[in-house]
Amino acid sequence: MMGSNYPEHGTKPRSAKYHKQQNHRVVRKQPPRPAVSDRHNIYITSKTDFKAQQRRCEELINSGAHEIFLHCMGFSVTRGLNIALRLVQNSDGALSYAINTSTVQLVDELHPLCDAEDITFRQRNNSALHIKILNNSLFDIAVPQPSQSQTQAQSLGQFRGKAKARQ
Protein backbone atom coordinates (compact mmCIF):
# COMPACT_ATOMS: atom_id res chain seq x y z
CA MET A 1 0.00 0.00 0.00
CA MET A 2 3.03 2.24 0.06
CA GLY A 3 2.79 3.31 -3.58
CA SER A 4 -0.97 3.72 -3.78
CA ASN A 5 -2.61 7.06 -4.52
CA TYR A 6 -5.42 6.91 -1.99
CA PRO A 7 -6.51 10.25 -0.51
CA GLU A 8 -5.25 11.02 2.95
CA HIS A 9 -7.48 10.11 5.86
CA GLY A 10 -9.45 13.06 7.13
CA THR A 11 -9.71 14.89 3.82
CA LYS A 12 -13.13 16.12 2.88
CA PRO A 13 -14.39 14.95 -0.53
CA ARG A 14 -15.60 17.60 -2.92
CA SER A 15 -19.32 18.04 -3.24
CA ALA A 16 -21.13 16.66 -6.27
CA LYS A 17 -22.64 20.10 -6.96
CA TYR A 18 -19.19 21.62 -7.48
CA HIS A 19 -18.15 18.76 -9.76
CA LYS A 20 -21.26 19.05 -11.94
CA GLN A 21 -20.85 22.80 -12.37
CA GLN A 22 -17.25 22.46 -13.55
CA ASN A 23 -18.01 19.59 -15.94
CA HIS A 24 -20.63 21.61 -17.81
CA ARG A 25 -18.44 24.65 -18.44
CA VAL A 26 -15.15 25.35 -20.15
CA VAL A 27 -12.95 27.89 -18.38
CA ARG A 28 -11.15 30.39 -20.61
CA LYS A 29 -8.70 32.50 -18.66
CA GLN A 30 -8.35 36.01 -20.03
CA PRO A 31 -4.83 37.48 -20.00
CA PRO A 32 -4.40 40.57 -17.83
CA ARG A 33 -4.36 43.84 -19.68
CA PRO A 34 -1.02 45.63 -19.51
CA ALA A 35 -1.35 48.94 -17.71
CA VAL A 36 1.39 50.65 -19.69
CA SER A 37 2.77 49.67 -23.08
CA ASP A 38 6.16 51.30 -22.80
CA ARG A 39 9.48 50.00 -24.04
CA HIS A 40 10.90 50.07 -20.50
CA ASN A 41 8.11 47.84 -19.09
CA ILE A 42 8.86 44.15 -19.55
CA TYR A 43 6.20 41.55 -18.77
CA ILE A 44 7.80 38.30 -17.61
CA THR A 45 5.97 35.11 -18.61
CA SER A 46 6.77 31.46 -18.10
CA LYS A 47 6.29 30.71 -21.82
CA THR A 48 9.08 32.94 -23.14
CA ASP A 49 12.66 31.66 -22.99
CA PHE A 50 14.54 32.78 -19.86
CA LYS A 51 17.71 33.75 -21.73
CA ALA A 52 15.71 35.77 -24.27
CA GLN A 53 14.02 37.77 -21.51
CA GLN A 54 17.36 38.37 -19.79
CA ARG A 55 18.96 39.43 -23.09
CA ARG A 56 16.13 41.90 -23.73
CA CYS A 57 16.66 43.48 -20.30
CA GLU A 58 20.42 43.72 -20.87
CA GLU A 59 19.90 45.34 -24.28
CA LEU A 60 17.60 47.97 -22.78
CA ILE A 61 20.09 48.80 -20.03
CA ASN A 62 23.04 48.89 -22.44
CA SER A 63 21.12 51.20 -24.78
CA GLY A 64 21.12 53.89 -22.10
CA ALA A 65 17.89 53.32 -20.18
CA HIS A 66 18.05 54.76 -16.67
CA GLU A 67 15.47 52.29 -15.36
CA ILE A 68 13.42 49.31 -16.49
CA PHE A 69 10.40 47.68 -14.89
CA LEU A 70 9.82 43.92 -14.72
CA HIS A 71 6.20 42.85 -14.13
CA CYS A 72 5.37 39.23 -13.27
CA MET A 73 2.38 37.36 -11.88
CA GLY A 74 1.70 34.03 -10.23
CA PHE A 75 3.98 31.26 -11.43
CA SER A 76 6.39 33.66 -13.18
CA VAL A 77 7.26 35.57 -9.97
CA THR A 78 10.30 33.37 -9.30
CA ARG A 79 11.42 33.79 -12.91
CA GLY A 80 11.19 37.58 -12.60
CA LEU A 81 13.21 37.52 -9.38
CA ASN A 82 15.86 35.32 -10.99
CA ILE A 83 16.18 37.69 -13.96
CA ALA A 84 16.48 40.74 -11.69
CA LEU A 85 19.08 39.10 -9.45
CA ARG A 86 21.15 37.94 -12.44
CA LEU A 87 21.08 41.41 -13.97
CA VAL A 88 22.27 42.98 -10.70
CA GLN A 89 24.90 40.29 -10.15
CA ASN A 90 26.33 40.63 -13.68
CA SER A 91 26.47 44.44 -13.49
CA ASP A 92 29.31 44.63 -10.91
CA GLY A 93 27.40 47.09 -8.74
CA ALA A 94 26.15 49.32 -11.55
CA LEU A 95 22.51 48.24 -11.05
CA SER A 96 20.20 48.28 -8.05
CA TYR A 97 16.59 47.19 -7.65
CA ALA A 98 13.39 47.91 -5.74
CA ILE A 99 10.52 45.44 -5.41
CA ASN A 100 6.79 46.09 -4.90
CA THR A 101 4.04 43.52 -4.53
CA SER A 102 0.38 43.82 -5.46
CA THR A 103 -2.76 41.83 -6.08
CA VAL A 104 -4.27 41.79 -9.57
CA GLN A 105 -7.91 40.97 -10.27
CA LEU A 106 -8.36 38.60 -13.19
CA VAL A 107 -11.55 37.67 -15.03
CA ASP A 108 -12.27 34.15 -16.31
CA GLU A 109 -14.96 33.34 -18.85
CA LEU A 110 -17.01 30.22 -18.14
CA HIS A 111 -18.41 28.92 -21.44
CA PRO A 112 -21.22 26.35 -21.15
CA LEU A 113 -21.01 23.12 -23.10
CA CYS A 114 -24.71 23.30 -23.99
CA ASP A 115 -26.32 26.25 -25.78
CA ALA A 116 -29.13 26.66 -23.25
CA GLU A 117 -26.92 28.51 -20.75
CA ASP A 118 -25.16 31.86 -21.02
CA ILE A 119 -21.50 32.70 -20.65
CA THR A 120 -20.68 33.66 -17.09
CA PHE A 121 -17.68 35.47 -15.67
CA ARG A 122 -15.66 34.71 -12.57
CA GLN A 123 -13.27 37.10 -10.82
CA ARG A 124 -10.20 35.87 -9.00
CA ASN A 125 -7.11 37.44 -7.46
CA ASN A 126 -3.51 36.72 -8.35
CA SER A 127 -0.30 37.92 -6.75
CA ALA A 128 1.95 40.20 -8.79
CA LEU A 129 5.48 41.51 -8.44
CA HIS A 130 6.85 44.76 -9.88
CA ILE A 131 10.64 45.06 -9.96
CA LYS A 132 12.29 48.40 -10.75
CA ILE A 133 15.90 48.06 -11.89
CA LEU A 134 17.92 51.27 -11.69
CA ASN A 135 21.14 51.99 -13.53
CA ASN A 136 23.33 53.77 -10.96
CA SER A 137 26.18 54.55 -13.35
CA LEU A 138 24.02 56.61 -15.70
CA PHE A 139 22.84 59.34 -13.33
CA ASP A 140 23.91 62.38 -15.30
CA ILE A 141 24.65 65.50 -13.31
CA ALA A 142 24.15 68.43 -15.64
CA VAL A 143 26.20 71.47 -14.71
CA PRO A 144 24.54 74.56 -16.17
CA GLN A 145 26.74 77.12 -17.88
CA PRO A 146 26.75 80.41 -15.95
CA SER A 147 25.28 83.40 -17.73
CA GLN A 148 27.06 86.80 -17.92
CA SER A 149 24.98 88.36 -15.14
CA GLN A 150 25.85 85.45 -12.83
CA THR A 151 29.57 85.75 -13.58
CA GLN A 152 29.53 89.50 -12.86
CA ALA A 153 27.72 88.96 -9.56
CA GLN A 154 30.21 86.27 -8.60
CA SER A 155 33.17 88.50 -9.43
CA LEU A 156 31.74 91.28 -7.23
CA GLY A 157 31.11 88.78 -4.44
CA GLN A 158 34.74 87.67 -4.49
CA PHE A 159 35.98 91.17 -3.50
CA ARG A 160 36.17 91.07 0.29
CA GLY A 161 37.45 94.56 1.08
CA LYS A 162 35.55 97.83 1.35
CA ALA A 163 34.39 99.33 -1.88
CA LYS A 164 36.25 102.54 -2.72
CA ALA A 165 34.56 105.41 -4.41
CA ARG A 166 36.15 106.15 -7.77
CA GLN A 167 36.64 109.67 -8.90
UniProtKB/Swiss-Prot annotation:
Which residue ranges are recorded for the region named Disordered?
1-36
Q: What is this protein called?
A: Ribonuclease P protein subunit p20
Identify the gene encoding this protein: Rpp20
Q: Do the record's keywords include Cytoplasm?
A: yes
Recorded hits in PANTHER family, A to Z, give: RIBONUCLEASE P PROTEIN SUBUNIT P20
Which portions of the chain have biased composition (kind: Basic residues)? 12-31
List, in alphabetical order, the GO biological process terms annotated in this UniProt record. rRNA processing; tRNA 5'-leader removal; tRNA processing
Query: Is Ribosomal protein one of the keywords?
Result: no
Specify the signal sequence span: none
Which keywords accompany this UniProt record?
Cytoplasm, Nucleus, tRNA processing
> Which lineage?
Eukaryota, Metazoa, Ecdysozoa, Arthropoda, Hexapoda
